[in-house]
Amino acid sequence: MANEGDVYKCELCGQVVKVLEEGGGTLVCCGEDMVKQ
């Protein structure tokens, strides 16, 4: 579950995202789960 303010990074392409609104599920980029920083 992604919480507001969390930062996630894709280990394949390096894209970084910051969560603005809490929600369920997983963040995915390039077909892989993103890693919480």
Swiss-Prot record:
Q: What SUPFAM superfamilies has UniProt attached to this entry?
A: Rubredoxin-like (SSF57802)
- Domain of life of the native organism: Bacteria
User: Which cofactors are reported in the record for this sequence?
Assistant: Fe cation
Q: How is the cofactor bound?
A: Binds 2 irons ions per subunit via 4 cysteine residues per iron.
**Per its record, how is this protein called by name?**
Desulforedoxin
Q: Which NCBIfam families does the protein's record reference? A: desulf_FeS4
* Role noted for this protein: Nonheme iron protein possibly involved in electron transport.
Describe its assembly: Homodimer.
Residues reported in the UniProt entry to bind Fe cation: C10, C13, C29, C30
Q: Name one Pfam family in it.
A: Desulfoferrod_N
Alphabetical keyword list: Electron transport, Iron, Metal-binding, Transport
Point out the signal peptide segment.
Answer: none
Any one GO molecular function term:
iron ion binding
Q: Which family does it belong to?
A: To the N-terminal section of desulfoferrodoxin.
